[in-house]
Swiss-Prot record:
Its EC number is 4.2.1.19. This is Imidazoleglycerol-phosphate dehydratase. One of its GO terms (biological process) is L-histidine biosynthetic process. Belongs to the imidazoleglycerol-phosphate dehydratase family. Keywords: Amino-acid biosynthesis, Cytoplasm, Histidine biosynthesis, Lyase.
Amino acid sequence: MNRRTAEVERYTLETQIRVQVDLDGTGKGKFRSGVHFLDHMLDQVARHGCMDLEVEAKGDLHIDAHHTVEDIGIALGQAFAKALGDKRGIHRYGHAYVPLDEALSRVVIDFSGRSGLFYEVEFPRDRIGDFEVDLFVEFFRGFVNHAQATLHIDNLKGLNAHHVAETIFKAFGRAVRAAVERDARTAGVLPSTKGLL
């Protein structure tokens, strides 16, 4: 069975991004984005998504992290679209609930071919260290627009901003893992009655 891998390079006047993904990996990650808290979250995605993921980025961090975070989401979405190909034989849908102490989040994803982000997260503060938490929505929007996926992210409980972020990214990894997993019973079959995703 072919491994589902992809490499994407995205170069703009604001950022230079390289992403490698192996959807059939073991959870290994290597991250050098210059945005340390995002690297920590991407490591959660790789580990809990059981995918191998490498991200290298150089961005205009002297301004802020916005372009770098958003463009990593875009490149990751492009890599997923490339690795999944025509999506034959995958489950297509995935969901996960993840707790961390007082925090609890739910993520549901559909690799439907239709892009949509439905993000209901209230952080108890604006920053985690020097990371602006409103950049998470830019990351996920970039991802769904280029992976052509519908993504629902709901934080159900949480008092600690770091815990909230971790539950979101761990649940995202686990939901993605479930959705892209191959289903032996439907090998070679497109998971849609429409005949196209």
